[in-house]
Regions:
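Surface-exposed, charge/polar-rich loops and edge strands
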Residues: 2-354
Length: 354
């Protein structure tokens, strides 16, 4: 494979094309359909998706639920305002957090939130500046307190506050643990999912808890030097069997979102098949890497030079992906987390080597 540089994945995007709020209704977002067989592009609405699905196809969605993990509190006893962003559970009520202002939150610092029924003590400062923090509360679970006091950790390019926190959750989200939404799934409504199932298309779930590393820019010039962040995933027996049966019958496995895609490809690369398992993955999919599971991908339009546009290029082909993004800008598609979607139809990743 020819070496590729980060700048190869740059494209110019007018700021006004960065979506600040989701489409309403969700399935009114636009859908760019990219056809592997003839390289044609079609411009549709997301609710038209069932027209491009066939009986026996399998959609794989990520059921991870976003934590309202950004909480603002005051340091005790000074009353200075500070902020914690919960990144991952370490053990019990101890979490790794991003703290602001980090330098003023040394081990032993106590913080109270809201009416004081949620407090936290900083245990340790890590090499990267993150903190280990233990939480104390008067409810059965910490999640109840986060629902009460927390805010959704929106990406930095979204500057508008949400009218409703559920706008940043998929309709099928149930496994709490993500620091960001698996955004391709935001376009689905219960009615659209019913329509898809009525066509004979199966829908199954995996879990991958999206970390804030998904927003971390690639620093290295040579993309192969980039080290991916690690994220926890889980695949059930039911999902593994459905994927096996779908493949055996000659039908397509279509990942809804890059997180579902990375989960399936990580498991397939590790075991040579999809099996029930859980663990952590730092899989990096870029042009030249072979796909071993998925036959199609539903995804949003991603940031320039991000690992996600590299993933799309790996599946659809670098030149074709960058051309499609150029068309997206020309046609005034809405970009990033609350933006429009694309559906890469057909192909099992072999085209991505071009």
């Amino acid at each position: 494979m020819l070496s590729m540089l980060k700048r190869d994945f740059w494209y110019d995007l007018p700021k006004e094309l960065i979506a600040q709020e989701p489409a309403c209704p969700r399935d009114a977002a636009r859908l760019m359909v990219l056809n592997q067989k003839d390289d044609s592009i079609q411009h549709r609405i997301f609710r038209d998706l069932p027209e491009y699905l066939e009986p026996g196809d399998l959609l794989v969605v990520n059921n991870s639920k976003v934590l309202p993990a950004r909480i603002v509190g005051v340091k005790q006893p000074t009353g200075a305002v500070c902020e914690l962003l919960l990144l991952r559970q370490v053990k019990g009520d101890q979490w790794e957090c991003l703290a602001k202002p980090g330098k003023r939150m040394q081990p032993g610092t106590k913080v109270s939130f809201g009416d004081g029924s949620l407090t936290a003590i900083v245990d340790e400062t890590l090499e990267d500046g993150n903190k280990f923090v233990t939480f104390y509360y008067d409810t059965e679970t910490l999640y109840e307190k986060l629902d009460e006091f927390g805010k959704m950790p929106l990406p930095p390019y979204i500057t508008k506050q949400l009218d409703d926190q559920s706008q940043y959750q998929t309709v099928y989200a149930k496994e709490l643990g993500s620091a960001a939404a698996p955004t391709a799934g935001l376009h689905f409504t219960p009615e659209l999912m019913d329509t898809i199932r009525a066509k004979g298309v199966n829908i199954t779930e995996v879990t991958l808890h999206v970390g804030l590393g998904t927003f971390r820019p690639v620093q290295e010039d040579e993309i192969t030097d980039h080290k991916m962040h690690s994220e926890w995933y889980s695949v059930s027996e039911e999902t593994a069997k459905l994927i096996h049966d779908t493949k055996a019958a000659g039908h397509r496995v279509i990942a809804v979102g890059t997180t579902s895609c990375r989960t399936l490809e990580a498991v397939a690369a590790k075991y040579g098949e999809i099996r029930a398992c859980s663990g952590n993955t730092d899989i990096f999919l870029y042009p030249g890497v072979k796909f071993n599971c998925i036959d199609g991908l539903i995804t949003n339009f991603h940031l320039p030079e991000s690992t996600l546009i590299m993933l799309v290029s790996a599946l659809y082909g670098y030149e074709k992906t960058m051309a499609a993004y150029k068309v997206g800008v020309q046609e005034r598609y809405r970009f990033f987390s609350f933006g429009d979607a694309m559906f890469i139809r057909g192909g099992n990743g072999t085209e991505g080597k071009k």
